[in-house]
């Protein structure tokens, strides 16, 4: 084990660690209602998304077929978002207490792939294409606001408003409306890619930005609440724990690793719905 750490961790090893932490996090997420799952599962799980993000940054940078890479991420993200949309609007397949999964990290990664390609085009001095790619992601929510303002009658037509809602939550999501991740996750992803090649600078800047967004800003809002005590930043508002993923990122040795290529794509949706289904059965059994 010490020898492996000395030699660093390859991409497969980092993903495996992230996968294990993600499972702990989602066990807490889906079975928290039992009161039997320790919060530490969720705390450890805060490191999972940043690690997967880092691995996706490296994967996108090194893949030989970016279009296929993007389509795979887009396809999985769109399918999961479509099912989530169905649960929200049709109120189908919900757990007895009304709970349904809001796991949409692939949509964040899909949007980031577009931004990363834009960053590369800017590096290649293809300024028009680069700016257009990044602007498409950033401006899409505002385009939709302008569109709905120009045609307010759409919101009065149930079928039309449903179609629009589906489009902007599933195949063409707004970065402001994704139910998993946050704007700090997207900003962090853009920074990780833009600063690739300078590992210490990359991770220092990323960690500072995440700490500012998820600790400092959160603390500023939380401290206005009556009864808030600073220790709640370690027991309730612990999203910022993800910053410690930088320590594992530092161990990355630049190697892709062997095996499990497809596992990391399909394990995410598979384990989400298996755990969700199990939680539904367990909830019904406890009633």
Outline where the language-model segments fall.
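Alpha-helical transmembrane segments and their immediate juxtamembrane cytosolic regions
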Residues: 1-287
């Amino acid at each position: 084990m010490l020898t492996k750490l000395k030699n660093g961790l390859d991409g497969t090893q980092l993903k495996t660690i992230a996968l294990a932490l993600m499972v702990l996090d989602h066990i807490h997420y889906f079975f928290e209602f039992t009161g039997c799952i320790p919060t530490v599962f969720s705390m450890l799980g805060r490191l999972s998304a940043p690690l997967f993000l880092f691995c996706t940054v490296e994967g996108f940078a090194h893949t030989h077929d970016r279009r296929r890479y993007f389509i795979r991420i887009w396809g999985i993200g769109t399918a999961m978002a479509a099912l989530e949309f169905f649960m929200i609007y049709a109120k189908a397949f919900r757990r007895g207490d009304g709970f349904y999964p809001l796991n949409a990290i692939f949509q964040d990664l899909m949007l980031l792939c577009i931004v990363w390609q834009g960053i590369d085009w800017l590096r290649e001095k293809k300024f028009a294409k680069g700016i257009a790619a990044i602007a498409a992601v950033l401006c899409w929510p505002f385009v939709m606001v302008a569109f709905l303002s120009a045609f307010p009658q759409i919101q009065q037509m149930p079928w039309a408003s449903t179609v629009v809602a589906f489009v902007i939550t599933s195949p063409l999501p707004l970065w402001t409306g994704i139910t998993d991740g946050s704007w700090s996750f997207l900003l962090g992803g853009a920074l990780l890619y833009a600063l690739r090649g300078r590992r210490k600078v990359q991770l220092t800047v990323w960690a500072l930005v995440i700490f500012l967004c998820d600790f400092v800003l959160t603390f500023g809002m939380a401290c206005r609440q009556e009864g808030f005590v600073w220790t709640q930043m370690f027991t309730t508002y612990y999203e910022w724990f993800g910053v410690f993923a930088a320590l594992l990122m530092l161990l990355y040795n630049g190697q892709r690793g062997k095996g499990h290529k497809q596992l990391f794509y399909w394990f995410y949706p598979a384990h989400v719905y298996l755990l969700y289904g199990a939680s539904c059965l367990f909830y019904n059994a406890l009633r």
